[in-house]
Curated annotation (Swiss-Prot):
EC number(s) per entry: 2.5.1.78
Protein's name according to its UniProt entry: 6,7-dimethyl-8-ribityllumazine synthase
Gene Ontology CC terms, in alphabetical order: cytosol; riboflavin synthase complex
Sites where the protein binds 5-amino-6-(D-ribitylamino)uracil: 21, 55-57, 79-81, 112
Family assignment from sequence similarity: Belongs to the DMRL synthase family.
Active site: 87
UniProt keyword annotation of Repeat present: no
Length: 152
């Protein structure tokens, strides 16, 4: 038997956690995610957004949303751009581990849509220009995974 997640958002409720840090990028990621969700028939009233100060706070907010039992998937959006110190490496690693852990412990699809880039230019490219919109891609993954888990 094959299981496959359909790309129809009808009847899905989606939570989104967005970092305010680098909001000139994360705002574009959020717009891309919401656009894809609505285009795939997720009702706008069934999309909830939680804003957090920075990427490091994303896993905790994602966990709280997941634990409510209200959502079929949670999308995490943020942008970490390398600076002159090792702070970037710690933040990227901890956010990725934290988001993965939330998904593993709750059994809910928690989609990693956090950009980890070397430069501002790379972030801009991934937020709706040359390299597409990673927020939109995260929304597609959320719809597919939510439906896949419903079919298993």
């Amino acid at each position: 038997m094959n299981f496959e997640g359909k790309l129809l958002g009808q009847d899905l409720k989606i939570g989104i956690v967005v970092s305010r840090f680098n909001d000139f990028i994360t705002g574009r990621l959020l717009d891309g995610a919401k656009d894809v969700l609505v285009r795939h028939e997720v009702e706008s009233e069934k999309i909830d957004v939680a804003f957090v100060p920075g990427a490091f706070e994303i896993p905790l907010a994602a966990k709280k949303l997941a634990e409510t039992g209200k959502y079929d998937a949670v999308i995490t959006l943020g942008c970490v751009i390398r600076g002159a110190t090792s702070h970037y490496d710690y933040v990227c690693n901890e956010v990725a581990k934290g988001v993965s852990k939330v998904s593993d412990t709750t059994g809910l699809p928690v989609i990693f849509g956090v950009l980890t880039t070397e430069t501002i230019e790379q972030a801009v490219e991934r937020a709706g220009t040359k390299a597409g919109n990673k927020g939109a891609e995260a929304a597609m993954a959320a719809i597919e995974m939510a439906n896949l888990l419903k079919s298993i």
